[in-house]
């Protein structure tokens, strides 16, 4: 069973590193009022040498990220959407509950309107589907947490002064 997590981990990597920016860019070109505010992205934040210098040795920043990743990604989003809502949605949506759950997950990210299509697509195919298919919330937790692990290594590099 757990070998099935590998294709979904590869899928989230390809999705996040190659396809999300294209899909989100297309979305924003159709609806420019949903564009990301200037200077809002993590990339813009980390491009400032002044900020990078301040974060060297700032272990509190790394700890804050880890706590946020645990409570938001794992305990918040995954156990709420896949552990609580998905099984209950099957009563209404039947075998298409995973699609409805992924769409709901995407619109949960309404505070980042430029990324709604990306959140819907990843929510449906990379988080909700494996959880539904294998009847294990851990499938969604592991795949979704891969994103957090990636960012944890980036932030660790900043704190260690490697960036």
Pin down the residues of each PLM region.
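Membrane-interface helix/loop boundary segments of multi-pass membrane proteins
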Residues: 29, 76-100, 129-136
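Active-site alpha-helix of zinc metalloproteases
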Residues: 69, 73-74, 82-83, 105, ...
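Residue-level signature of transmembrane alpha-helical entry/exit and packing/kink sites
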Residues: 1-5, 61-66, 94-101, 116, ...
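Short, motif-level signal for alpha-helix interfacial/capping segments enriched in acidic residues
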Residues: 51-59, 87, 113-127
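Residue-level signal for transmembrane alpha-helical positions in Major Facilitator Superfamily
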Residues: 18-19, 63, 77-81, 96, ...
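Functionally important transmembrane alpha-helices
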Residues: 99-108, 114-163
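Short, amphipathic, aromatic/basic-enriched membrane-interface segments that mark the entry/exit
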Residues: 72, 84-93, 108-115
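Juxtamembrane helix-loop-helix connectors linking adjacent transmembrane helices
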Residues: 1-72, 161-163
